Amino acid sequence: MSAEDLLRWVYGEYGDKLCLTCSWQKQSSVLVHMVSELDLDVNVVELDTHLFFKETYETRERIVDRYDLKLIRPEIITVAEQHKQEGPNLWERDPDRCCHIRKVEPLIQALEPYDAWVSGIRRDQSPSRADARKVERSDRYGVWKIQPLADWSEKEVWAYITANDIPYNPLHDAGYRSIGCIPCTRPTRPDEEERAGRWADSDKLECGIHLEDAHKGDEGKE
């Protein structure tokens, strides 16, 4: 089933109980464009950690304006509040805990009204995502997880963006093949896998939102 056909099907099944999460990376651009072209009225959930790059926020504004998105932002504590509760620079001392506070807990909150969630995961992004399926049951969040681009390559993502003149995060042009929070993201070298620039100085592989068996304070280890 193509990505477009899968989106049509899942929207027909779940309607306003379906949402799309966006990180404002290249795969987010593709999915937002597809949803718009298919005329699907889908809420878009953003997990704004308050630690994004300036270019990421600018990309968000361009995409929201172009596609007239209904953006849902779950409540996330400020960085200052986190410093008070957990101490300064938690991302350096315990990145798993930081991701849990700033991404996992807000996503749990955001998904409560929904029965299905569209994500931009692709199998070729990293070994930890190699077994991703297009439709999975997430017992952790109590929703169906829909991954229309699971079988797409990075090359196919860029070809779709180029063919459809879709706005994308300019950090991708500066060597950032995967983009997250400022303290935990660096450009990727040509010989590295796509997500190698994330948490590069640790053995952490994932922020935790896509790990079904992850527990509080233990995200990212597989």
Feature annotation, model-predicted:
Residues M1-E222:
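Nucleotide-activated chemistry modules centered on ATP-dependent adenylation/adenylyltransferase
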